[in-house]
Curated annotation (Swiss-Prot):
Protein name: tRNA (guanine-N(1)-)-methyltransferase
Family membership noted in the UniProt record: Belongs to the RNA methyltransferase TrmD family.
Entry annotated with the keyword Methyltransferase: yes
GO biological process per UniProt: tRNA N1-guanine methylation
Gene: trmD
Predominant location: cytoplasm
One of the record's GO cellular component terms: cytosol
Gene3D superfamilies documented for this protein: 3.40.1280.10, tRNA(m1g37)methyltransferase, domain 2
Quaternary structure note: Homodimer.
Length: 247
């Protein structure tokens, strides 16, 4: 996968993209990430990329010309036969989910546009942007941090990035539930014991315990995720019992 990021602050990506799984994925050439400085494409003398909004109001708005030219440069470099997704990180966008991550992970190329100040000129959105995505109901300084979050989530789903497919299939949200608790050595620590079922060696019992824990955690913390989820008869009974306890 090729990922191209249009930003005013390309240096922000060096740390997160130069460590851990993202670094290894790039070394394995499973993902190719490049950042482009929008300011480099400004044609004015002072490389100015923002201006006052028409109609008045607080803050500055990013102007069309540098972004259009930067986007054109990137699409030319990618040598695209057909348009690829251009994602604008915006609090007005649809909320990013694991389902969306799985959808984007199937793409061969992605372009991310990071806004700043009060946002970008609407004509950029109308002409270039295919998706507006938000990572939550709050406002950040720019689109750089959301871009990092989304690229990280997508990269984990690319075949070969994680050691096994099970590594991400068991994670929170992949199957619609929050992930079950994890334990490691020692068996006892400060008087706190590991659940005996995890030491039993009975994989059927372990799988059932983990599933039940996932359902209980989801019920307690994200009950909205259970709506519309297809549960087995015994799992639906667990939820019913949890509901009774809560009454």
């Amino acid at each position: 996968m090729k990922v191209r990021i249009l930003t005013l602050f390309p240096e922000m990506f060096n740390g997160p993209f130069g460590t851990s799984i993202l670094k290894k994925a790039q070394e394995k050439e499973l993902i190719d990430i490049q950042c482009f400085n929008i300011r480099d494409f400004a044609l004015n003398k002072h490389k100015k990329v923002d201006d006052y909004p028409f109609g008045g109001g607080a803050g500055m708005v990013m102007t069309p010309q540098p972004i259009f030219d930067c986007h054109h440069h990137v699409t030319q470099m990618l040598n695209l036969n057909e348009p690829c997704k251009t994602i604008y990180l915006s609090p007005k966008g649809s909320t990013f989910t694991q389902e969306k991550a799985m959808e984007l992970a199937k793409e061969e190329q992605l372009i991310f546009l990071c806004g700043h100040y009060e946002g970008i000129d609407q004509r950029i959105i109308d002409e270039l942007v295919t998706d507006e995505i938000s990572i939550g109901d709050y406002v950040l300084t720019g689109g750089e941090l959301p871009a990092m979050v989304i690229v990280d989530a997508i990269t984990r789903l690319i075949p070969g990035v994680l050691s096994t497919e099970a590594s991400y299939e068991d994670e929170s949200f992949h199957c619609g539930l929050l992930e079950y608790p994890h334990y490691t050595r020692p068996r006892a620590f400060n008087g706190l014991e590991v659940p005996s079922v995890l030491l039993s060696g009975n994989h059927k019992d372990i799988d059932m315990w983990r599933r039940k824990q996932s359902i209980e955690l989801t019920f307690e913390r994200r009950p909205d995720l259970l709506k519309g989820l297809q549960l087995k008869k015994n799992e639906a009974q667990w939820v019913a019992e949890l509901s009774k306890k809560k009454e």
